[in-house]
Amino acid sequence: MPAPQSAQEITHYENFPVASWLCPPHLRAPIAAIYWFARTADDLADEGDASPQQRLDDLAAYRADLMAASKGQSASTRWPQVFSYLAVAIVKFSLPINYLDDLLSAFEQDIRKTRDGQGYQTEAELHDYCTRSANPVGRLLLHLYGITDAKALSYSDDICTSLQLINFWQDLSQDILRGRFYIPEDECAQFGVSRAELINSVQTKQQSQNATKLIAAQATNTPARMINGSKLVHLIPGRAGWELRFVVQGGLRILDKIKALNFQMLIHRPKLNTWDYVVIGWRALWM
């Protein structure tokens, strides 16, 4: 599995808000290295038929290699396509290791939650997960751009958390069948929707009115956070600022499509088409 040489090869890891040709050329290598680190960890946590314990063991070994690379030591020979590139980026750009470690923590949490049949009790618990599964990506990118302002970091967190939540609502029908439940359980109880009903709705392609109201409540709460975070586009100059405009508008467009489908996310999964990209581009121009 060769490592990507530029951000143009980034196509899989949905939590990674980075595009292709808009990425500043001098940052493509470190961004690709960070991406490949996250992508490989995601695969360890999610792909194949390994047991939960084997996945956790693999991520523990992966973390050990990260710590070795952060100290200038040789990593194991298991993932040379990851750590040979990442080690260079760590030294050259002084990457904050805690953000990379947070991503691994989130992957481990996903494995344990799925293994134990657990969901998220409250919105606060779900958002805490997002602080490790999504927000580190934005903070790493800001670090590469040399932006450390607290307000900018807060805006970045809002964008990344919003993107993660949008991905959850978009992928409900897929995640539920994989034993992953991201709608907070207290919200489910409030709307009178059980986990068994969610599973049955996906399997039968029939969604109750209460389930629709539940999903609508989640999706309609997300845009405000994204719009607040979008102030970041005015703090980042050049290509990176334009790239971020497309990222923000892409997330908001998915929310538009969720609404257009009457929040029937247990039946449908919205996807962007050519016209959507035209709309995204137009909206990005006017941010």
Residue ranges of model-derived segments:
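Catalytic cores of Mg2+-dependent Asp-rich isoprenoid enzymes
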Residues: 1-163, 169, 173-287
